[in-house]
UniProtKB/Swiss-Prot annotation:
Keywords: DNA-binding, Transcription, Transcription regulation. One of its GO terms (biological process) is transcription initiation at RNA polymerase II promoter. Gene3D superfamilies: Winged helix-like DNA-binding domain superfamily/Winged helix DNA-binding domain. Residues 1-93 form the HTH TFE/IIEalpha-type domain. The gene is tfe. One of its GO terms (molecular function) is DNA binding. The winged helix domain is involved in binding to DNA in the preinitiation complex. Monomer. Interaction with RNA polymerase subunits RpoF and RpoE is necessary for Tfe stimulatory transcription activity. Able to interact with Tbp and RNA polymerase in the absence of DNA promoter. Interacts both with the preinitiation and elongation complexes. Pfam families: TFIIE_alpha (PF02002). This is Transcription factor E. It comes from the Archaea. Transcription factor that plays a role in the activation of archaeal genes transcribed by RNA polymerase. Facilitates transcription initiation by enhancing TATA-box recognition by TATA-box-binding protein (Tbp), and transcription factor B (Tfb) and RNA polymerase recruitment. Not absolutely required for transcription in vitro, but particularly important in cases where Tbp or Tfb function is not optimal. It dynamically alters the nucleic acid-binding properties of RNA polymerases by stabilizing the initiation complex and destabilizing elongation complexes.
Length: 170
């Protein structure tokens, strides 16, 4: 489960910041938080990983927004607000559960759209069109000009249903 969580963290950050390096850096940040089993400030994380505090904060705040790290807020003796970050098994479990829920919703809507209508596919560029779109284009792909072919959705629906059921077991 930890590997799946680390994969989610890495890919989410890499996608958001359009940088695989940031994704790998986020993975290191959460691995550190998980392995240390303690709450750490962003400054402490930056020092331990030898990276800038600004990068650390940016990554941690994005992960917090996604619910991929835990955060605690406390007031120091000099009345400053200090945030400490942590990753534990509960955070990992909840993050994976939330991702599974989102995936199930997307698969469910895809199954619904496939069962409600007929679809046509271009055999050359593999673009998919609804019946209305195919009629509007005269049965010809607007991208490459190839004749569109009707597609039976039964196999796709079966695959999606199996994927939905496997996610349901999580």
């Amino acid at each position: 489960m930890k590997e799946a969580y680390l994969y989610i963290v890495e890919k989410s950050v890499a996608w958001e910041f359009d940088s695989p390096e940031y994704g790998r850096l986020a993975r290191k940040v959460v691995e550190l938080l998980y392995d240390r089993k303690e709450d750490l400030t962003d400054d402490r994380v930056a020092i331990l990983l030898n990276i800038s505090t600004a990068e650390t904060r940016r990554i941690l705040q994005y992960l917090m927004k996604l619910g991929l790290v835990g955060v605690k807020k406390r007031t120091t003796e000099d009345y400053r607000i200090e945030y400490t970050w942590y990753v534990d098994d509960d955070v990992i479990r909840q993050a994976i559960k939330n991702r599974a829920k989102v995936a199930k919703e997307k698969i469910s809507s895809l199954i619904k759209s496939l069962t409600e209508g007929a679809y046509y596919v271009c055999p050359t560029c593999h673009m998919r069109y609804t019946l209305d779109q195919a009629v509007n284009y005269g049965g010809v792909c607007p991208v490459c000009g190839t004749q569109l072919e009707y597609v039976e959705n039964v196999e796709e629906i079966d695959k999606l249903t199996k994927a939905y059921e496997s996610i349901d077991k999580i």
